[in-house]
Amino acid sequence: MLHRYLPMTEEDKKEMLQTIGVQTIDELFSDIPESVRFKGDLKIKEAKSEPELLKELSQMASKNANLKEYASFLGAGVYDHYAPVIVDHVISRSEFYTAYTPYQPEISQGELQAIFEFQTMICELTGMDVANSSMYDGGTALAEAAMLAAGHTRKKKILVSSAVHPESRAVLETYAKGQHLEVVEINHKDGVTDLDVLQSEVDDTVACVIVQYPNFFGQVEKLADIEKIVHQQKSLFIVSSNPLSLGALTPPGKFGADIVIGDAQPFGIPTQFGGPHCGYFATTKAFMRKIPGRLVGQTVDSDGKRGFVLTLQAREQHIRRDKATSNICSNQALNALAASVAMTALGKQGVKEMARQNISKAQYAKRQFEAKGFTVTFAGPFFNEFVVDCKRPVKEVNDALLQKNIIGGYDLGRDYKEHENHMLVAVTELRTKDEIDTLVNEMGAIQ
């Protein structure tokens, strides 16, 4: 039988076998003992035509709670944000839609400039001097930042706030184990890093301190106070930040952060079951030659025209092999492009307005919950997430909400035993007043 995408005739098979010097398929696999060869018929359905296959896959996909039909209040690192329509158009162009790393600048100026623009916008948002072309996601960016700090300071202890995303902390633990580094968690108090505990833990053995801004609970950390503690012992100050929040919050670079990392998912990258994402990594000029990942620089060609190239390549795996600054090399260029297009389409004022709407709508939701008798756990300033005490298992609440076409918030009890029955609610610019009111009313009815 001829298949549409497997056009191999019997004549093709015969020619291939002759080329490699065997006569039959059995002879090709003669090294595999007869006793372990499968001789029956596979219990699978008959092949389907393309229309039949599309229909079946559509039926399977319809079982998912998709964000076109459900109002999502689930965040915890992956958010339902508006992506300008132009994003999909640009990233679908054949010039970009490839995993090829642009080693040859003479044929890759478009890709290189797109990466350069991404780096530039990340620097503008974070207040840092230099940014790389992307990382896999926020978690790997955080771990890579810690590895840079340990290598630079030659110290073995990493302090990380317990208010940093649990999955990012898990990635950090994996990296640290391989490098024989000690990871110490700093407890949170009232939803933010406990500064008294941090002060007692920072000493001359600490390579870096890592906090999140806004943190996993949505709270805005006091970066100015943390920076003073961190730099007393010449440790590095690493901040993981939601880039959209920086449209409203003071950039970490203004507070003296040495490295700012995070996930660019809020800009043009759909939730898509949790990935793939696009991490970013920004730092100061002092660490430019130690930064992981690709770096694109601007230069001029022999005719004096502006051009773009991969620069400082001696840091990288294809040059230095095991001595490279990182083993991340296949970057997220397509997702970085999506983020770049989204940021460009929104513009500076658009990013600010998008951030403002997140704050405004989240504040409205908080007031509605309190008016309904719910306790909002933490009283400090927050961006677009806050914690609500459900007084009962969050899974039960979310199961009930799902029946009303609502995707509820994140169950904090999965990661924090002290926050059992607490829900992390995310409210983005896409949520309407009616959707927020419906969420609060439905949860009130479940109480």
Swiss-Prot record:
Its EC number is 1.4.4.2. GO terms for molecular function: glycine dehydrogenase (decarboxylating) activity. It comes from the Bacteria. It catalyses: N(6)-[(R)-lipoyl]-L-lysyl-[glycine-cleavage complex H protein] + glycine + H(+) = N(6)-[(R)-S(8)-aminomethyldihydrolipoyl]-L-lysyl-[glycine-cleavage complex H protein] + CO2. Keywords: Oxidoreductase. InterPro entries: GcvPA, GDC-P_N, GDC_P, PyrdxlP-dep_Trfase, PyrdxlP-dep_Trfase_major, PyrdxlP-dep_Trfase_small. GO terms for biological process: glycine decarboxylation via glycine cleavage system; nucleoside metabolic process. Belongs to the GcvP family. N-terminal subunit subfamily. HAMAP family: GcvPA. The glycine cleavage system catalyzes the degradation of glycine. The P protein binds the alpha-amino group of glycine through its pyridoxal phosphate cofactor; CO(2) is released and the remaining methylamine moiety is then transferred to the lipoamide cofactor of the H protein. The glycine cleavage system is composed of four proteins: P, T, L and H. In this organism, the P 'protein' is a heterodimer of two subunits. PANTHER family: GLYCINE CLEAVAGE SYSTEM P-PROTEIN, GLYCINE DEHYDROGENASE (DECARBOXYLATING). This is Probable glycine dehydrogenase (decarboxylating) subunit 1.
